[in-house]
Amino acid sequence: MEELQRYLEIDRSRQQHFLYPLLFQEYIYVLAHDHGLNGSILYESMENLGYDNKSSSLIIKRLIIRMHQQNHLMISVNHSNQNRFLGYNKNFDYQMISEGFAVIVEIPFSLQLVSSLEEKEIAKFHNLRSIHSILPFLEDKFSHLNYVSDILIPYPTHLEILVQTLHRWIQDAPSLHLLRFFLHEYTNWNSFITPKKSIYLFTKDFTKENQRLFLFLYNSHVYECESVFIFLRKQSSYLGSKYSGAFIERTHFYGKMEYLVVVLRNDFQKTLWLFKDPFMHYVRYQGKAILASKGAHLLMKKWKYHLVNFWQCHFYLWYQPDRIHINQLSNHSFYFLGYLSSVLLNLSAVRSQMLENSFLINTAIKKFDTIVPIIPLIGALAKAKFCNISGHPISKPVRVDSSDSDIIDRFGRICRNLSHYHSGSSKKQSLYRIKYILRFSCARTLARKHKSTVRTFLKRLGSELLEEFLTEKEQVISLIFAINSSPSHRSYRERIWYLDILCINDLANHE
């Protein structure tokens, strides 16, 4: 770690040109696999190959020696088991190097993130990483908007596009050549095994074996796809700065402001006229994005046309226009982050009296509403073998050596995680049914293990089994409920967003 820290203190421009030598440092692989390789994909691969944890450092050294030998870095002509990629085991060596390579190329981006946070004086930046931080933003902004577009960001179909994307950020030519070699070799190997499935790089096998590298490449690709929003927003803000003067160093820019506005107007007048909208909001999670606006339907159609042409011309991606859906927020619900969100119109009547005359005033208040869709969630539970397709709880096959406490803790942890993630739902009826399914699935699993009945286990465990399926907040509310039922009932219906959720629950991710 000390060696890596010294390297990080080098000037940023020099780092981008000298990333490749880090690939031959042992501490990079130790850092990539959590200081000892325990619990990582690499450690599991070693167990499958018959290695133990003590020899992991020796394996890395042998791999680095083979990397120095150029004859092992040549693309194999015939894909056979005897002539494998980078040595004796292609998959094992590829995982090791891809994990280390992902750590190395993340260095310039990490430095930019740290410097940006320091300039903006953001101390608790981990709160910004939370998925639930998006939902309060939607709750605050979307109630004032009119139209929303569901956008599915396309995957890159050509390997060279990914390499050229990184070339704009990293000037280290050997690292880019190595990345190009990795991607082509992987697709060539897959085309030999499964010829019909070699068109796309981001397959399930690639994402599972090279998760860190996949996330880095995919995030880089998505950032480039989103560059059109950043570009148009900046140009639009430049035009508005003629009257507001929103420059940091105003004394140096006042003289050039008029000329700058004239140039931008001449070059981008038509484009900005199409897309300038002060009430445009954009959010994204993984490959799905939401674009909402207060403008008219025509403006959203122009954005759709521009995005399709931009992705096709700039990234050579054939994107189907029907993958972007434009709907009105007042009569349409959109699915995002495991929630079915919509804008409800609450009507209320207020009686006003002035002297002898009374008036009845009707008011309409827009409210952003989020609910949990029960049918997709039950489908996810059925896929995980907790229930059947109709939502009836079933028993899960477990290992004989699993104790009753381990089984109860596992089911309870899944239930608490789902309740924790869906705490922002305005209606808790769906969560009640999910808890019922998981609780009785746990009871059926225990009854199956001991060859008994469900009623017997429910009588024996009683409240102990119920407590495992309650979150900490529900346990506190259950204590308050005995004192005063009305306030606790209201608090139980409140929506709560947690800033400690960094990833979506697997059972909730059924998009």
Curated annotation (Swiss-Prot):
Keyword tags: Chloroplast, mRNA processing, Plastid, RNA-binding, tRNA processing
GO MF annotation terms: RNA binding
Localization, UniProt: Plastid, Chloroplast
GO cellular component, as recorded: chloroplast
GO biological process entries: mRNA processing; RNA splicing; tRNA processing
Main location: plastid
Function: Usually encoded in the trnK tRNA gene intron. Probably assists in splicing its own and other chloroplast group II introns.
Family that this chain belongs to: Belongs to the intron maturase 2 family. MatK subfamily.
Name this polypeptide is given: Maturase K
Taxonomic path: Eukaryota, Viridiplantae, Streptophyta, Embryophyta, Tracheophyta
Gene name tied to this protein: matK
